[in-house]
A protein has these predicted regions:
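Short, charged, amphipathic alpha-helices and their helix-cap/turn boundaries
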Residues: 61-75
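Signature tryptophan residues that serve as conserved aromatic anchors
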Residues: 1-4, 26, 69, 99-101, ...
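Short aromatic-cysteine micro-motif
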Residues: 1-36, 71-92, 178-179
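Structural motif
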Residues: 59-62, 171
Length: 191
């Protein structure tokens, strides 16, 4: 289950601002400085188990399985970060394992708005939140850097016993989480 909105409510023991990150920051971090579907070599179509040709030819999964926890190698559960190699930024599990809950509201036209001059890409209007990156049940084609979906608020709260329904956690979804971002330590940046 996901503790919704928990990053913004984290105890501020370090004296820094913390938050869930916006979708574009997450995509940049997941790409590890690259501009390709994955931060490693490969084509989503080659890794995917979907499609007509998969009846005759196996998917090429050696490279993706080294970096991503997804349906083919997850054993139907999340895995520890040490199970995969890091991306060029040194980050693990940026794709797959769990979908990332983002600070943005979902807008299906988000990428067509604003053009190249967007200074604050955070979308604050809408009903559902952005989740991205696929999870341990996803096909390889759905664990790309740009893979984006949205929360299904009512469906993810069906068995929540609280009345009114909780605003803090989703009772009916597995494979979703969030990353906390915080402002950098000025002492480290000066070195």
């Amino acid at each position: 289950m996901l503790q919704k909105h928990s990053a913004s409510g984290c105890p501020n023991k370090q004296g820094k601002n913390t938050a869930c990150r916006p979708r574009q920051n997450g995509e940049y971090a997941a790409r590890g400085g690259t501009e390709t579907p994955y931060f490693f070599t490969g084509n989503p179509k080659d890794f995917s188990d979907q499609g007509f040709w998969r009846k005759f030819f196996d998917a090429k999964t050696d490279s993706i399985s080294s970096f991503v926890i997804y349906a083919k190698n997850s054993k139907n559960r999340t895995q520890e970060p040490g199970e995969v190699k890091a991306n060029p930024f040194g980050l693990k599990n940026m794709l797959g394992n769990v979908m990332e809950y983002c600070a943005d509201k979902y807008d299906p036209k988000a990428y067509s708005k604003g053009g190249d001059n967007v200074t604050n890409p955070l979308i604050t209007e809408g009903e559902e939140w952005v989740v991205r990156g696929g999870n341990y049940t996803s096909d390889a084609a759905d664990v790309r850097s740009a893979a984006r979906d949205y929360t299904k608020h009512d469906a993810w709260l069906k068995t929540d016993p609280q009345q009114p329904k909780s605003i803090w956690w989703y009772s009916d979804i597995r494979g979703i989480g969030f990353r906390v971002v915080c402002e950098p330590d000025p002492a480290i940046g000066a070195k």
